[in-house]
Amino acid sequence: MEQNIISTIRDECIRHRSKYLTIAQLTAIAEAKINEFIITGKAKDQDLSSLLDKCIDILSIYKKNSKDIKNIISCKNKGAMISSNSVMIIQLNYVYYKVIHIIVTTNIPHLSEFAKIKLHKSTSDEGNGNNNNNEFQLMNIYNTLLETLLKDENIAKIKSFIKSSIKQTKLNHEQEECNLMRTGSYITSNQLNSLISSSANSASSQMEILLIDIRSRLEFNKSHIDTKNIICLEPISFKMSYSDHDLEKKSLITSPNSEIKMFQSRNLFKFIILYTDANEYNVKQQSVLLDILVNHSFEKPISDDFTKIFILESGFPGWLKSNYGRQVSSSFPSNNNIKDDSVYINGNTSGLSLQHLPKMSPSIRHSMDDSMKEMLVAPTPLNHLQQQQQQQSDNDHVLKRSSSFKKLFSNYTSPNPKNSNSNLYSISSLSISSSPSPLPLHSPDPVKGNSLPINYPETPHLWKNSETDFMTNQREQLNHNSFAHIAPINTKAITSPSRTATPKLQRFPQTISMNLNMNSNGHSSATSTIQPSCLSLSNNDSLDHTDVTPTSSHNYDLDFAVGLENLGNSCYMNCIIQCILGTHELTQIFLDDSYAKHININSKLGSKGILAKYFARLVHMMYKEQVDGSKKISISPIKFKLACGSVNSLFKTASQQDCQEFCQFLLDGLHEDLNQCGSNPPLKELSQEAEARREKLSLRIASSIEWERFLTTDFSVIVDLFQGQYASRLKCKVCSHTSTTYQPFTVLSIPIPKKNSRNNITIEDCFREFTKCENLEVDEQWLCPHCEKRQPSTKQLTITRLPRNLIVHLKRFDNLLNKNNDFVIYPFLLDLTPFWANDFDGVFPPGVNDDELPIRGQIPPFKYELYGVACHFGTLYGGHYTAYVKKGLKKGWLYFDDTKYKPVKNKADAINSNAYVLFYHRVYGV
């Protein structure tokens, strides 16, 4: 059989003129061999025992070859050349696996003998001697084979090897064609895509490819080809008399530093690709630019032997119409025509974001180009001039969304530290790479997105007549020194410490606002007020970013402790700040100021960076006092509170508020300020057809798709660190019709059940109460769309995504504002695995395969370690907030009471009856 298959593979390789056959071609060979050796064979070869024997024989050969394959793949990953014999072994093993897989999953289940055995097994209560023993043995062998297939790790490596090899062969062929072309030639979208892909995977020391977009900055911001090395050179910014020196010093004067640096290295790139749109003037300027680069590059001559300059055939419009048209930064030009629900109907995933969330917090890796996919690097002062005008005139500016599942997750790396190659939604994990390479997680410059610091210089009006020399002259007269007062933001960031290498996650429901008009002696007073003169930001406090320069790599002590002054009933704010600063990942990005790179002033619900900026100032003040001070001190958070009041009037006065509500406000506000998709249009409601199809899916799959839809409008470090999701399902008790909605959350509010006199209440009881199936009252009955009238119905909540940091609010106040003071027992180590939706049934939407949905950290178990407790004493009308926060092994647990803080002698004190908001961090290996 082996020689027969080898001969067939060789014949197919010759026929297709390729060293490698595709997965589909190898599968076809496997199917043909099954027909040849089994189906058309003797009758005895078709009984269950014979088929199982054949599978066992083939499996033994497969296992034997797998040892060699590990070495082959290891050598390939190290860059070694792979021999033809090695390639044949890999392809042969794939056929072996596929033969076994088809026999076990397709042929055997269709045997009448197999059906009878299954029937006997399910209906028989007692054994019937040898026959039943024989049937039992056959079923055992079958189940063992099936389990072996499902748990086999080698097939994923084989598939990855074959796919990557075919892709690389194609890329090499395309690049060879480009190497033979002369400067000034036109290249196709296929060739450009090959160059981009080859550049991303290249180990060469030479920089591969630079794209120059010759359109207006406004059009560039809206949408451009998605690649790492790309600059925008506006058509109006240069003329025929320019040299390469003029381009650098004049045309790029308002460009970001990152683009200027790329252009300065233009002679080091292997390929430079020019492209524009169909505008006649732009096409003319494209030719002018080509002439400048080829014939007037005096400062850095470009040699055709080292650097080739090509023009993209059909320009940007042609790229959009090609198969790679969705590979653009910002939203797709055709995005408005894509229904948000198309993934449920026909598997069209192009309307989803499918961003690759980082393994750590976004923006805290050494290079932004390799960190969070949609995060933006900091702009330089000079690009503010033009970008502010563009943003003011383009309120619909949309950040980029990525392409389909198939492109982004073919190399998706699971964040699970234990099983980096598993896919929760894959039955057999056959399609996951064994050693996937990181995705090209571009961190576009501000010109690619819309994240900018606040407080720009006054923007002069730019003339619209692009063909006049006046504009060029004005550009030449711009004085770089006039912008010198704006400090550039360093594009480098540092790695955030994390309690553990945890996955990442997601978002929030709105909660009912409660004004807790409390007073406290010495703590908070309802009568104490802030002087009116203090209730506005002075001119000196205007929001500029001149002092927000991301710090170079610094080993911060993230467990610093500083008290906070009570500004008159502001203990609700103080306790939450102390707890949130126990989240190391969040504290880090505000200490090193890498958050500033991601402020999105166009976010529709954001504060233009006000909240994020003043929160950062507060963190810096606290850290500085802790580091510089020789004794316990406290600081006044007055400016931060004023900033909160300017965003939400609820926090403007000196009245007491609910600390849980402030926690929700703060995290939501930071999210919107840093939301990279905050200017995207809202999601459309699902059509009835799409909703009906979604209801047929498991919660596991439907919630994952809904999460991807959610990320198209909400994508920030807060999502990564704090946000989760739950499903709310209504069910008609008459016809069993269901309707499910998926709600993101930042703070999860859970009810406290009625106390059983014999037992204490545990937090697990609260989660059971939160997720129990509830019979709706008569006046709350659901209007069932199937029955077309109100029917007896039920409602049930199910947690579908658990975040990296879980904030739990114990709902102590009822609808009448009475407080429940029952002691809820919560552990230091909390296991929420039983409350997580784990109902995957193998069903996907049409067109979506089992290896295409990102896991996003949703791999059980879900265990959490307590690190913060916000406590509330008293009643609705008089009370006080304090906090317990874990400050590492050295300092242990500290108790914060406004300005005062002290070590906790017994950490068990953190478990107390006054707990109101709990902060948990996900941990592994416990």
From Swiss-Prot:
Q: Which EC numbers characterise this protein's activity in its record?
A: 3.4.19.12
Quote the Pfam families the UniProt record gives.
Rhodanese, UCH
Instruction: Report whether Membrane shows up as a keyword of the record.
Output: yes
Hydrolase as UniProt keyword: yes
Gene3D superfamilies cross-referenced by the UniProt entry: Cysteine proteinases, Rhodanese-like domain
Top-level lineage group: Eukaryota
Q: Which residues form the Rhodanese domain?
A: 205-328
The active site of this protein is located at C571, H880
Q: Which UniProt keywords apply?
A: Cytoplasm, Endosome, Hydrolase, Membrane, Phosphoprotein, Protease, Thiol protease, Ubl conjugation pathway
Q: Which GO terms describe its biological process?
A: ATP export; endocytosis; free ubiquitin chain depolymerization; intralumenal vesicle formation; protein deubiquitination; regulation of DNA replication; ubiquitin recycling; ubiquitin-dependent protein catabolic process
Question: What is the main EC category here?
Answer: hydrolase
Bilayer topology reads: Peripheral membrane protein
> Which reaction(s) does its UniProt entry say it catalyses?
Thiol-dependent hydrolysis of ester, thioester, amide, peptide and isopeptide bonds formed by the C-terminal Gly of ubiquitin (a 76-residue protein attached to proteins as an intracellular targeting signal)
Give the recorded effect for C571 to S/A.
Answer: Impairs deubiquitination activity and protein sorting into the MVB pathway
Q: Which family would the database say this protein is a member of?
A: Belongs to the peptidase C19 family.
**Domain-level remarks:** Residues 1-208 are essential for the localization to the late endosome and constitute a late endosome localization (LEL) domain.
Its name, as the record gives it, is Ubiquitin carboxyl-terminal hydrolase 4
